[in-house]
Amino acid sequence: MSFVNVAPQLVSTAAADAARIGSAINTANTAAAATTQVLAAAQDEVSTAIAALFGSHGQHYQAISAQVAAYQQRFVLALSQAGSTYAVAEAASATPLQNVLDAINAPVQSLTGRPLIGDGANGIDGTGQAGGNGGWLWGNGGNGGSGAPGQAGGAGGAAGLIGNGGAGGAGGQGLPFEAGANGGAGGAGGWLFGNGGAGGNGGIGGAGTNLAIGGHGGNGGNAGLIGAGGTGGAGGTGGGEPSAGASGGNGGNGGNGGLLIGNSGDGGAAGNGAGISQNGPASGFGGNGGHAGTTGLIGNGGNGGAGGAGGDVSADFGGVGFGGQGGNGGAGGLLYGNGGAGGNGGAAGSPGSVTAFGGNGGSGGSGGNGGNALIGNAGAGGSAGAGGNGASAGTAGGSGGDGGKGGNGGSVGLIGNGGNGGNGGAGSLFNGAPGFGGPGGSGGASLLGPPGLAGTNGADG
């Protein structure tokens, strides 16, 4: 059995094109009218015969063109009527189906607060409203609305049996003297099939105090039986004041993969610490990256989020923010799957200079550990952040910051390659004592496969 799909809009467009063809035929008929009354060039028989030939040809052309024009008009009329008929039939068929669906959803909605079939409504931005849940049988969760200043983002709605979870809303920027608001969590995926929603990003910290840290990213939503976990939201940048920077927010953790099949979600990146432009105590620290979610039976582990960078100092003196820690990679599936890579540690901020004693450089953040695996390759450890330079000074320069430690590579239980260890961060030096390089991470072990390589130690300043 064969089927024909009809788009009423395309049929109407074709009818309009055919009407333009008819207009062109009428124009040709008008131009041919002049050739039906050709005068003889002279009084001889040859000229008279030639004039009669052209006149007869023009008359025959007009007769044929009249028939074509009549056919074309009937074709355009039929095509236009067909387009209208299809459009009416389509609207008529949609209305009963919608009425049937409404009749089914109405009692379920009134009893449970969510429909049987249908997507959840999105939360309104600027209100932090949560997204609506999807239908019990079929439907995606709605996205959470973003938060107003000082207000957390709304959580994403959950799916029912089949569907994807909604994304969490972004957190609002912090009010003066307050921290940034957290991002909303992603909604859960369908119990049978569907991915978890992504977490919302954290808001920027408010002004006026070094306690106004950036908002934390929302966690990614978990999958059900089959599906991928949602990605964690990014942490917000720290706020503060010109002489005291606030720390960045932490990245959200990734959602868990499906119990049967599905990758776990990546951890969210951390927010950076705020710098200072006037003399004060310190700039902000970088936030920590989010950890990847866990994996079920079959699937790859997610990657850990990167740590945030410490805030810079552009004033004469002030402490430098340390880099944040990278998130850990997720483990591979219990039966099969690769482990996720650890996130990189954040770099320390850059210091200013003073006329007497220089400030010390900040330490780099450590890299996250790679995920383990049973059958599959283990994840590599994350690289550490570099230590910050010590500040120059007229008398004694500041000490360089130490590099962070590289993350350890993941191990393999049965078959696969062990993960490589992350590289240690380099120490820094300006005029004071040098910073020490961070140690590299250990390589992961493997039962039936090559072990991972150890990470390189960071160079001393």
Swiss-Prot record:
Stretches for region Disordered: 232-251, 426-461
Gene3D superfamilies attached to this UniProt entry: HP0062-like domain
Subcellular location: Cell membrane; Secreted, Cell wall; Host mitochondrion
Keywords: Cell membrane, Cell wall, Host mitochondrion, Membrane, Oxidoreductase, Secreted, Virulence
Molecular function per GO: oxidoreductase activity
UniProt-listed Enzyme Commission number(s): 1.2.1.n2
All residue ranges annotated as the PE domain in the record: 4-92
Residue ranges, compositional bias (Gly residues): 434-446
Domain of life: Bacteria
Cellular compartments per GO CC: extracellular region; host cell mitochondrion; plasma membrane
SUPFAM superfamilies reported in the protein's UniProt record: PE/PPE dimer-like
Database matches in Pfam families: PE, PGRS
Misc remark: Was identified as a drug target. Docking and molecular dynamics (MD) simulation studies suggest that PE_PGRS45 could be targeted by drugs used in treatment of other diseases: Entacapone and Tolcapone, which are used in Parkinson's treatment, and Verapamil, used in treatment of hypertension.
UniProt family annotation: Belongs to the mycobacterial PE family. PGRS subfamily.
Assembly mode: Interacts with human TIMM23, which is part of a complex that mediates the translocation of transit peptide-containing proteins across the mitochondrial inner membrane.
Protein name (Swiss-Prot/TrEMBL): PE-PGRS family protein PE_PGRS45
